[in-house]
Amino acid sequence: MPDQTPAPSVLRFVDRHIGPDDQAVETLLNTIGVPSLDELAAKALPDVILDRLSTDGVAPGLEHLPAAATEHEALAELRALAQSNTVAVSMIGQGYYDTLTPPVLRRNIIENPAWYTAYTPYQPEISQGRLEALLNFQTMVTDLTGLEVANASMLDEGTAAAEAMTLMHRAVRGPATRLAVDADVYPQTAAILATRAEPLGIEIVTADLRQGLPDGDFFGVIVQLPGASGVVHDWSALVEQAHERGALVAVGADLLAATMITPPGEIGADVAFGTTQRFGVPMGFGGPHAGYLAVHSKHARQLPGRLVGVSVDADGSRAYRLALQTREQHIRRDKATSNICTAQVLLAVLAAMYASYHGPDGLRGIAQRVHGHARALAAGLADAGVEVVHDSFFDTVLAHVPGRADEVRAAAKERGINVWAVDADHVSVACDEATTAEHVADVLAAFGAAPSGADFAGPAVATRTSEFLTHPAFSDYRTETSMMRYLRSLADKDIALDRSMIPLGSCTMKLNAAAEMEAITWAEFGRQHPFAPASDTPGLRRLIADLQSWLTGITGYDEISLQPNAGSQGEYAGLLAIQAYHHARGDSGRTVCLIPSSAHGTNAASAAMVGMKVVVVACRANGDVDLDDLRAKVTEHADRLSALMITYPSTHGVYEHDIADICAAVHDAGGQVYVDGANLNALVGLARPGRFGGDVSHLNLHKTFCIPHGGGGPGVGPVAVRAHLAPYLPGHPLAAELSDDHTVSAAPYGSASILPITWAYIRMMGAAGLRSATLVAIASANYIARRLDEYYPVLYTGENGMVAHECILDLRGITKATGVTVDDVAKRLADYGFHAPTMSFPVAGTLMVEPTESESLSEIDAFCDAMIAIRAEIDRVGSGEWPVDDNPLRGAPHTAESLLVEEWTHPYTREQAAYPLGKGFRPKVWPPVRRIDGAYGDRNLVCSCPPVEAFA
C-alpha cells in the first residue's frame, strides 16, 4: 500500500519555487496595505471573472490536478513514463537524424543555467557571450550554405521554408503570386507552406522540378537538397532558368551534406533554409531544434527574426548587438517581415559549438562516414537484386520493393530499427552520425540482403571544393579543456538568472528548477524520432495527454494543441482557427481584427500573416481599452469583424474591469475573442480566459510554466480553444491521430522534448501551489510599485490602485526635466549588478518591471535600493552637479578597463562608477563592453565573425 504520510515541509517543492516565505509575504502585504493574498486578489481582479475556491479549498479548473509531488516523486514518475518508451535505432530520416551530443556541450550548455536561463539579448552590453555564440552560428550557416548573411535561428525547418517563401514574395515585388515547389520536399515542409500560403493569396504549384520550371509566372522556387527521397540533384540549371524568368530560388539544404556537396550559394540560389538539428541537437520527438535562414546580403533587410551584428562600444572596441531591429514585429507590428519573436537560441548555441568542437575536418569526416554507410547499404541491396531508385545520394537510400514495404519495415523493427515506408512499394533508409556497420547489416537482413564487399557503383557526390569554417572560432576549441573554458568565458560576460533577477516585464523570468530540467536529456525522450511508430512512445504520449488535460483545466478551454513551438506560432495557429471557423460558416468576409494600441507587436504581425486587416482600438488615459471606441469600431466593422486580440491582464500591467463587456461586445457582432496568454502568470488559479470570454488563447510555457528562455528560445506556445474551434486546431500529415490541415510546425507535437519541464512544474506545484505562485507574483509587483512610486511614478493601476504581476515606471517626466533617458537607467543598472526591466514597452520612455514569484524579498529589495540610488544620481544631474553628458548614468555601463586609465577626467569618482552602493552591496558584475553604438552597427552591417585582425 502506498505511503500516505504527508511529506515534511522541507520537501515541498512550492517552498523551493516561491521566493518569499510566509514572513516575507507578510512584509509585502503590509507595504501594499492589504491583510491577505486573497484580499489582494479581490482588490486587483474584477469580481466578475474571479474564481471562488470550492469548499475543499481548490480553485475551479484545478480540481483535476494530482496532489503536489516532491521533486523525487515527480522524477520517479517521469522516469517510469520514459522507461515505457522504446529507444529504437532511428533510420527514418525525413529531416530528423540521430546525433552524438558531445558531453562537454551537454554539461556546459544544455545543463548550465548560465546559458539556459538567459533572456533575448536586448541589453547587449551584458549579453556579449551569447551574442558571440550566435555570431558563430551565423558564420557557420553562411560558410556551409555559401551565402552571405544568416539570421540567429528559426523555429524549425518547416517554418524556415515558409519564411523563405514570404521573403521571396516580398523581394520580387512583381505581380506573380505563384510558388513552384519540388515534389521531393519533406511532407511536413509542404504542409506548412500550404498553411502559410493560403491566407496570403499565394498559389503553390507542386511539380517534379528536375524536369524544369512549369509554364507561367513565379516569384519563387523551393527545392530540397538532398531531396526527401535522398536524391542529390544538381539544381544549377533550374536556378538559371528561374532567374531568367524573374523568380528567386530557395534551397532546403542539409548542412552536414553541405560539407561534401556543392552548397546552395555556389549554384546561384538566393536563399537557403533548413535545420541544424544534426549538429549535436537530439531529435527530441520533434524538437526543439534551431532552424536557419540564409540569404545574399542584398536581401538582409528582408530576413525575419533576430540578426546579430558587429558594432563598436563607447571606447571604439568591437562589440556585438542585435542588428536591423526595425524589421521586427515589436517595432513594425503588422508591417514586420514576420511575427517571429522567440526563436531557438539555446539550440543555435549548441549547434555552433558542435561545429567549433569538431571543426571543418571533423564535420567533413562525420559526413564521409555517414555517406560511406549509405553507400555500403546501397551496395548490399544492389547485390541482392533490390532496386536502388537513386544512384546519387548522401545519407538516404530509397529502395524499390514492390508490395513488400510493410514487410521490410516490420523485419527491421524486429531488429530494433525504424525505417521509413514511403508507400507500399518503397522503403527509405537514412544513415546518420550514430549509424554503425552493425546497423547497416541488420537493415540489409530486413531486406533479405547482406553486406557487400564491393563499393556501390553510383557517382560520387563530394563536389564541394570551397573551404568553410576557416575562422579561428572553429579551430581553437578542439580539446575539451579549451571548449570548457571558452564556454565559461562566454557565460561570464552575461547576466542570466544564475546571477541576478531579470525583472523584464511581459517576459516572466521565473525559476527554471533543476528537477524540472533533469528529464530533457534522457535518451528515452531525446532520441525519439517524431515519426516513429506510436508503439515506441507511449510514455511521451501519456505525458502530452496529461499536459493537455491539465492546461485546458487551468485555462478554462476545451481542447489544446501543443504543436506551436513559440508564442508567435500559437498566435498564428489561433487566428487560423478563427478564420477557418468563419469560412466554414460561410463568413469569408470577416477579415477585420481589432487590436488595442497597447498590444505587443506580435499580435498585429500574426493577424497580417493570416490575411486580416488590423484596426487599432484606442486606450484611455488610465491604460484600459477605450470601451466607447471599441464599440464604435465593432459597429463600423460588424459584418467584417473576425476577432479581437486582447492581452489579459493588459500589456499595461493591470486587470481591466471592463473585460467581460469587451468580450460581449465582440461576440454580439459575431466576432471571436483571442485572449493573448502572455500574462497568464497573473491568472493561474484566479481566473480562466476560456470562462470569462475567450474563444482561443495561446499559452507561453516558457513564461508561465517554467520552460527556460534559453537566451531567446526555445519556447512552446500551445493554442487552447473552446469546443467550436477545436476542429481547426493544427494537424499534421504524418500523424495518424491528427488531421492533415492547418500544420504550423514541422513536428506533430512541436518541441516535445521540453514538455517534461512543464509537466514536472505542474506536478510538483499542485493546485494550491500554482495559485500561490500567482498570488505572490502579484504581491511582489505591487510591493515594487509601492516602494518605487515616489521616485518613478507608476503609470497605470487598476480601479483599486493595484497592478497585476508587473508595473510600468514612468521616466518621461524625468527625461524632460533632466535629460536622463530610460536607456541611461537601463545601462546603469548593470553597474549595480542587475539586468534592466523592459524598456519603452508598451509606452516609450518607461520601464516595465515584473519580479515573478520566484524572487526573494531580499533580491526585490536590492533591486528597489538600486533604483532609488539611481534616482538620487538623476537628481544630481538635474541639479547641475553632474553634466547631462558626463555622469555615471550616461557613462554606464563601466568596464574594469575604463576605470584603469591613468587620468580620470569625469566629475564622478571611479568608486561611484563601479560600486555605487559600496563593495558589499551584491556580487559585482563587470560588463565586458561599454555602451554600444547601435547606429554604427546598422550602417556598417557585419553579421559573421570578424577577422582576428579586427581585434588587434
Curated annotation (Swiss-Prot):
Listed InterPro entries: GcvP, GDC-P_C, GDC-P_N, GDC_P, PyrdxlP-dep_Trfase, PyrdxlP-dep_Trfase_major, PyrdxlP-dep_Trfase_small
GO terms of biological process kind: glycine decarboxylation via glycine cleavage system
A single Gene Ontology CC term: glycine cleavage complex
SUPFAM superfamilies given in the database record: PLP-dependent transferases
Catalysed reaction, written as an equation: N(6)-[(R)-lipoyl]-L-lysyl-[glycine-cleavage complex H protein] + glycine + H(+) = N(6)-[(R)-S(8)-aminomethyldihydrolipoyl]-L-lysyl-[glycine-cleavage complex H protein] + CO2
Oxidoreductase as UniProt keyword: yes
Alphabetical UniProt keywords: Oxidoreductase, Pyridoxal phosphate
Modification type N6-(pyridoxal phosphate)lysine: residues: K703
Entry's EC annotation: 1.4.4.2
Pfam families the UniProt entry points to: GcvP2_C, GDC-P
Gene Ontology MF annotations: glycine binding; glycine dehydrogenase (decarboxylating) activity; pyridoxal phosphate binding
Cofactor(s) listed in the protein's UniProt record: pyridoxal 5'-phosphate
Function: The glycine cleavage system catalyzes the degradation of glycine. The P protein binds the alpha-amino group of glycine through its pyridoxal phosphate cofactor; CO(2) is released and the remaining methylamine moiety is then transferred to the lipoamide cofactor of the H protein.
Family indicated by similarity: Belongs to the GcvP family.
Quaternary data: The glycine cleavage system is composed of four proteins: P, T, L and H.
PANTHER family reported for this sequence: GLYCINE DEHYDROGENASE (DECARBOXYLATING), MITOCHONDRIAL, GLYCINE DEHYDROGENASE, DECARBOXYLATING
Protein name, UniProt field: Glycine dehydrogenase (decarboxylating)
Organism listed in the record: Mycolicibacterium gilvum (strain PYR-GCK)
Gene: gcvP
